[in-house]
């Protein structure tokens, strides 16, 4: 949720530095049959990143819904887990990524019409609810269609909303943490939580969550 009234400075993330011999998939991931979404094994990740580089993921999962993600969290055990959005500003090693990669690119793109309200001062405000898979450019344009101001500086930020919140993305003096009202996430146990803005700590290109981990 956002309260509303270009160049991106993302640090690049490097993945897949460690490598070891993968176990047979049926032994490592015996629970995959519980997933409703698409599952790809030993999938090359280059096509899923903006700079088109990267080796294979042991397992690449496209969850159909939140329940799929909960299933992953409850069954993955000690397997590493990485959440992939639009794949912007991301460097994946040619050796690939061991463990599980979950792509949110094709899901969680719901975006609601603004909910308008008036503050005690009489000023008119609006709240927009959007999924983690919504592109930042689309979110900014969606707000503009309703003559809302507050996130227009973020229109040029690459990537999706979920990643932007995790990194407290910003441009031209505006950061996502300045307009964020609340965030709904899954904690490491797969439980749904909603955190208000004042429960989060925003730093330069970083958002600190109370429990340290979670999936937006």
Residue ranges and their predicted role:
Residues 27-161:
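Anion-binding (especially nucleotide phosphate/pyrophosphate-binding) glycine-rich loop
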Residues 5-7, 12-18, 23:
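Charged/polar low-complexity intrinsically disordered segments
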Residues 202-208:
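Flexible, small-/acidic-enriched active-site or ligand-binding loops
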